[in-house]
Swiss-Prot record:
List of residues binding D-threo-isocitrate: 123, 125, 129, 139, 163
Keywords: Glyoxylate bypass, Magnesium, Manganese, Metal-binding, NADP, Oxidoreductase, Tricarboxylic acid cycle
Cofactors demanded by this protein: Mg(2+); Mn(2+)
One record GO biological process: glyoxylate cycle
Gene it is expressed from: icd
A single GO molecular function term of this UniProt record: isocitrate dehydrogenase (NADP+) activity
Entry EC no(s): 1.1.1.42
InterPro entries, sorted: IsoCit/isopropylmalate_DH_CS, Isocitrate_DH_NADP_dimer_prok, IsoPropMal-DH-like_dom
Site, as annotated: Critical for catalysis: 170, 240
UniProt name for this protein: Isocitrate dehydrogenase [NADP]
Amino acid sequence: MTELTGVSIVTYQHIKVPSQGEKITVNKAVLEVPDRPIIPFIEGDGIGIDIAPVMKNVVDAAVEKSYAGKRKIEWMEIYAGEKATKVYGKDNWLPDETLEAIKEYQVAIKGPLTTPVGGGIRSLNVALRQQLDLYVCLRPVRYFTGVPSPVKTPEKVNMVIFRENSEDIYAGIEWPAGSPEAVKLINFLQNEMGVKKIRFPETAGIGIKPVSKEGTSRLVRRAIQYAIDNDRDSVTLVHKGNIMKFTEGAFKDWGYEVAVKEFGAKPLDGGPWHVFENPKTGQKITIKDVIADAFLQQILLRPAEYSVIATLNLNGDYISDALAAEVGGIGIAPGANLSDTVGLFEATHGTAPKYAGQDKVNPGSLILSAEMMLRYLGWKEAADLVVQGIEGAIESKTVTYDFARLMTGAKEVSTSQFGKAIIKHIL
């Protein structure tokens, strides 16, 4: 261990700890943020090299403007993906000290990561979520005036998705067709469990979908608490319980149980919907549920009826990206992955390697994820300025190519120029 401003820090092999700054800590489930927090960041693969510097510039400008030098983020680079293999060795896509640094410093932000080709880690993003138990994927979706949209009233979309991150078929428990494991499991299901419904057992890949009461409860608890803290009027449990009764159906039932037992929700008109009074504002919060396929229709037809969404992993993936398309695409869709102690904020899009190093793509997703991070730290003033800056740049039609090609009279600018336009509207 070494000492830094009175705070013990793990000694790292390749990570350079800033000479100034302090750790964020958690005390009795409350985040304690110093005025000069050290924030680890993963640049990301592909276009990460373009968007990460812009994100940091925008955040630094917003923090400086808000607090006049009294607060400042000390950025600390950590490694994952292709860059990690160059620093740590060709097969080390997710170094142990990267995970340790995120745990040590509590809050981090990352660009997009390449999924390694071949065996081993199937997805670096999934590996990070599982190894850090980041059980909430938080995806707020809102519309910025002037952003091109394929729907008539995108301004009606204002939802926050709580996607369960640790279970469901994303747990990665599956085996390919014909493998010894698949054959063994199928034989067990047929011979020991009496399963007759596998149509082509000889050529079937097989997977397992775990959904637990504990996993469901902690997600729904966070979603309901978010609705309370942010004065939202409803929490919707989205599921396919009509088909998968003991996994998705159980998710719905356990979700209602949390609302009743922990928040005092009462049946609304005899149920199944429930309602309770927000203890902070006195407003009513409705707990409801919708079948996933019907919900995907409703977000197009009646989006204003939905506010906070709690759902399982696969449904959450579909829903998050479908909603993002309504308000301008994943180029400006932010996201975070949360445990009870760690917050990892991220760009929600891919690495787009063909654009890497061209200073061309929209950095909005990562910048808005940083805005979420600032709000998570309690730095509301800086977060509001980031939103102000993005709104100003878009309203002035100074945008990257993905928006410019769809906007009349727009001025197409580079990634870095878009960052400067945002900062102009911050300052």
